[in-house]
């Protein structure tokens, strides 16, 4: 990927993670790692967001919230699963209340592993997500032209 | 007079890194009642002790919460050591307390940053988190992890800190102090911050005691209780431990208490780093907890007293593990503080209890 055609805004939701990944997501946005230099801004509004960063393994209670946020986001959109729990359920995979992985709830495009996920892995995931976002938006435009 | 409206707050809200849902019953701009709903992070970790070995569970205990990760692994290990009658080496006790106080520094600076974000001071938020990175670097250097450390084990600790690194701890923390004081100036002396926080979300001392609030939240309401003053482990060897309390009982007082606790933690680390004895860092632990044996333990987490209870059944798996975490104690206080406040102050008040929902719901 040569350059990003867009400065993506991200939205973050904690779907039953232990909090470790959440503070790493925030740390990635802060001066230590500073993803704002790529134009990435954290937003609270799903309608403004291009990239959805989900942490945690998703439980019975918050699966509807995860789905709702995903549905409210406007196309094209990319989901990044941050942390081992979000990828597969991780250490909590055999807990009774855990569904096990964000991909059980919504389609996931990029998996960023780590327990807790390192900010470098999040940045790498978001950069990959940018490429996918570009492809999705091209496909969307082509479909519109075709119609 | 307007009519009553219910405004939902959360679970997805920019001010909260973790989900909690509040139903705010609002008349005009005033909150009449706040009804918290929890369960968004419940995983069922206390049930996991039945399927995991007591040595394995320490890694699960650490992942109860990513901010107080070290505190939970330390509290769990101490409980199991009490359960099995293990005495750990003095050096391990010192190392645990040094790391634990370091995690208190990182947690409080993190909280100060989030509080700045809640009252709309984004530059201050960024400055706090920049400072916090330097504390995390110390963690990374000695344990290998930034937020999850896996360094405590039943019977001691996994890694030692050598003399040179301890000196570096002291040097880095001394270096942080100057910058930290500048940041504190902005929090405690800036009139715009003062006007935003003073007199907001007041909880008088009697109410704080009645609601059994714990930690800095209670100490800001002038409750003089801190588990560290009981002198468990290496805390007993401190030459002096002064409680930090405030009489203002409002959001400003909570900021004041936490800001002062960071300096106190730096002093504790400096004293213990100078005093630390030589010796082993762990003792081997064999066997299993006896059938019916029970142990309890409490520990001052960054957010307040955390209470642990464990019961053995003669096998390597525990019969029961129970934790009472500081935020679950403080949620009642939060609901009281929210009553009658302005809707614009809700996020400020919710944040000043330093909610750690992952701990609460496990």
Where are the model-predicted features located?
Chain A
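Iron-sulfur-associated redox domains of electron-transfer enzymes in respiratory
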Residues: 1-147
